[in-house]
Design a protein with these regions (language model features):
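Classical protein tyrosine phosphatase
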Residues: 294-310
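Residue register of alpha-helical TPR repeats
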Residues: 236, 282, 340, 388, ...
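Intrinsic, low-complexity transcriptional activation domains
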Residues: 1-203, 224-232, 238, 252, ...
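Fungal C-terminal regulatory tails
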Residues: 86, 311, 353-355, 364, ...
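"A position-specific structural signal for the A-helix of alpha-solenoid helical repeats
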Residues: 240, 286, 340, 344, ...
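Fungal transcription factor middle regulatory core
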Residues: 116-163, 195-198, 214-221, 243, ...
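Intrinsically disordered, low-complexity transcriptional activation domains
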Residues: 134, 410, 613-720
């Protein structure tokens, strides 16, 4: 017996592992029977209860160090405090509802590795009419940025957003359609179509130039005026022709010429075709673009969205086999129509902060190309390289909205995303063909499509960098003490601010040069928009050490040009002028609260406004700006004395279609020299090159002043 016990103990000691104790399933445990420990166990399979064989989960005990427990407790406390502060930082115009504290295991969405740092926890809505749904305000919209700036100037984070009311209402469109809109005479129709092709067809590919004129002649020759498809297309073209050749259209009840033709074309295209045609897509493009002339931005977005979906239904985003479409003109037209839809989708969305409607990964189409013979190409199409550059720029614009103004989750920091976007913009401007570059020696010779391309580029730079510029202004205001100096602001923030100011000055110069030369369209949307965007940045620049006090004069010039455009019937200019006028009132109010100072007049202006207004410390050391400041129109490189006298003695000089501004040359601002500012200049500065050359690791180690990019969103952390 003892030998047997010793043998058993010896076997157990020599066993490599102790036998695991079998845990019974719930059924075997209740019946107090032996369980095999399988899943399902043998007893449950035997009685047909295999699906009910369940085991009670075991709560094992593990040993951890005390330091690890302390680390978990401190991390838990940090997340609770961060969640509470994030919940309290909400928009002032939102309903004051307490936000629920997220559970401890919820992802930390205030970190840029999870969510965009530029926007708040909730979307921005503004109710201005109780009978309609609240308006969504996209942070990428320039009017939204103007509201943020006005809140900063006044120190009032409850300052309401200014809604857009200057647009052609649905009742006015219905009234315009009710008029007896007829085909014009052949000669007038041909003239209107040629004007439309010349003015908008040089910027976007909308129609085949020669084929469109030939089709117009065929319609008048055969008398076939009843085709709805043709009537929609040509009435839309007539609308553009009138917008660029007339000053007003009183019979339509609208301030914008061409509204009657637009209303008629829109009504005829209400029924969407089940089998769409390229002609119908052309019409949707024309109607979408003209909607901007009526300042109907939402309608424009809906129309281009319809065109995109119809284009997908016929596979425009794919290459069609040559065997199924032999005609090279039709093949190239198909390609270019899609890319125009693509450009509109990206550009229209960027104006309001809406996402792109199709990702780039779903597009499998060749870029535009030339066809042979060259004469045939020139008769039907515009410059291929210009359209290609426009497509590439639109792609960057779409990425800017997605990476900086959306709630998508990214592992990269804010500065890393900005750096990648600026690298793409730098590559775009460096690879731009020579004939698409601006002629710095003679700014008056800029062709319309080239200047439009560079204005779009500058706006993309502004979109990418202006949140940082506003952040810089806020940081100078937060700590009103001599300790706030240029060393407390990281160099990347200063560099991005300078790039934003440079782009704004360049756009301002291009548009005012067009205004003086009389080539600025009265009823266009985009020049008014770009002027408004640049004026906001220049107003901010006048307060910053990297800017110049003279930029405030450029702001005043932009305000006067928008006022004159508004008086001539430009609805978009009316909206933007009203916004800038409110900004000017905030600037004047801020200036009136400044104490009288006997310091050097050349010192950077500072503000010590009383009350709740912001205060920028006057002790901020001046930083050498690499962007040439604006100067008055009296500088000889741009205007001679005779030209200045001509403008002074003739108020209508240089203004399209007989506009009558009241401002004098002394209020106008221009660059020091005609070639003083170039599109690529901001990317040539050493500080910008250093920023673009930094690694992701370096940009991930943010300067203390930039922790807002990791911890709090840009606007709500400043109570705007």
């Amino acid at each position: 017996m003892n030998r047997r016990r010793r043998s058993r103990s010896t076997d157990q000691a020599s066993s490599p592992s102790k036998r695991r104790k079998i845990v019974a399933c719930q059924r075997c445990h209740d019946h107090k029977i032996k369980c095999s420990g399988d899943q399902p166990c043998a007893k449950c399979r035997q009685v047909g209860c295999a699906d009910k064989c369940q085991y009670t989960p075991r709560d094992r005990q593990v040993k951890v160090s005390e330091s690890y427990l302390n680390l978990l407790e401190s991390e838990n406390q940090r997340l609770k405090e961060q969640s509470a502060s994030s919940a309290n930082a909400t928009e002032a115009d939102h309903d004051a509802e307490p936000e629920p504290v997220p559970p401890a295991d919820a992802p930390d969405e205030s970190n840029t590795s999870v969510r965009n740092p530029l926007i708040g926890d909730r979307a921005w809505f503004h109710r201005y009419d109780p009978s309609t749904p609240p308006l969504f305000i996209g942070e990428a919209a320039c009017t939204a940025f103007a509201t943020r700036f006005r809140r900063f100037l006044t120190g009032n984070n409850a300052l309401p957003h200014i809604p857009r009311t200057q647009y052609v209402k649905e009742e006015q469109i219905a009234e315009a359609n009710a008029t007896n809109v007829q085909w014009p005479s052949f000669h007038q129709a041909r003239l209107l179509v040629k004007i439309a092709i010349r003015q908008v067809g040089s910027i976007y590919h909308l129609v085949l130039r020669k084929s469109t004129l030939e089709k117009l002649e065929e319609i008048y020759r055969t008398g076939d005026f009843d085709c709805t498809v043709n009537q929609c297309k040509f009435f839309a073209l007539f609308a553009f022709g009138e917008a660029y050749s007339m000053r007003a259209e009183p019979l339509s009840g609208s301030r914008v010429p061409g509204t009657s033709y637009f209303a008629r074309a829109l009504s005829l295209g209400q029924v969407l075709p089940e089998r769409t045609s390229i002609t119908h897509l052309e019409t949707l493009l024309l109607l979408s673009l003209f909607s901007y002339y009526l300042n109907r931005r939402h309608s424009a977005l809906v129309l281009i969205g319809t065109a995109l979906r119809l284009g997908l239904s016929i596979g425009l985003n794919h290459n069609i086999p040559e065997s199924q479409l032999i005609d090279p003109v039709e093949r190239q037209h198909r390609i270019r129509i899609w890319w125009t839809i693509y450009i509109f989708d990206r550009m229209w969305g960027s104006k309001m902060g809406h996402p792109s409607q199709i990702p780039d990964d779903d597009i499998h189409l060749d870029m535009p190309s030339n066809i042979s013979p060259a004469q045939l190409h020139e008769e039907q199409f515009t410059d291929t390289e210009y359209l290609t550059a426009n497509v590439k720029l639109a792609r960057i614009v779409g990425e800017t909205i997605a990476k900086l103004y959306s709630r998508r989750k990214y592992s990269e920091t804010f500065l890393q995303r900005v750096q990648k976007l600026l690298k793409a913009l730098k590559s775009w401007v460096e690879t731009l063909p020579e004939h698409l570059r601006l002629n710095d020696d003679d700014p008056g010779t800029y062709m319309k499509h080239i200047s439009s391309l560079h204005l779009s580029f500058n706006q993309c730079v502004i979109l990418t960098t202006r949140p940082t510029l506003l952040h810089l202004l806020m940081k100078l205001n937060e700590t009103n003490s001599p300790s706030t100096n240029h060393e407390s602001i990281s160099q990347p923030v200063l560099t991005l601010g300078e790039a934003c100011i440079h782009a704004a000055r360049h756009s301002h110069t291009l548009i005012l040069t067009k205004w003086i030369n009389g080539s600025l369209p009265v009823f266009g949307y985009f020049h008014a928009h770009y002027l408004f965007s640049s004026a906001l940045v220049l107003a901010m620049s006048s307060f910053l050490p990297i800017g110049s006090p003279s930029d405030l004069g450029a702001f005043e010039s932009g305000l006067e040009v928008l006022r004159s455009m508004s008086e001539n019937g430009n609805l978009a200019a009316s909206e933007f002028y009203h916004n800038l006028e409110q900004v000017k009132q905030c600037l004047d109010l801020r200036k009136s609260k400044e104490p009288k100072s006997t310091s050097n007049a050349d010192q950077q202006p500072s503000t010590t406004a009383s009350g709740s207004g912001p205060t920028i410390p006057s002790t901020f050391p001046p930083t050498v700006s690499t962007v040439p400041p604006a100067t008055t129109v009296s500088d000889p490189p741009l205007l001679t004395t005779a030209e200045a006298d001509l403008i002074s003695n003739n108020p209508g000089y240089g203004h399209a279609q007989g506009s009558n501004p009241t401002f004098t040359p002394g209020n106008l601002t221009f660059p020091t020299t005609a070639g003083g500012i170039t599109t690529a200049m901001a990317f040539l500065e050493p500080t910008m090159q250093d920023f673009l050359a930094q690694s992701d690791f370096d940009l991930g180690l943010l300067h203390p002043v930039d922790t807002f990019m990791n911890d709090e969103n840009l606007y709500t952390c400043h109570d705007l």
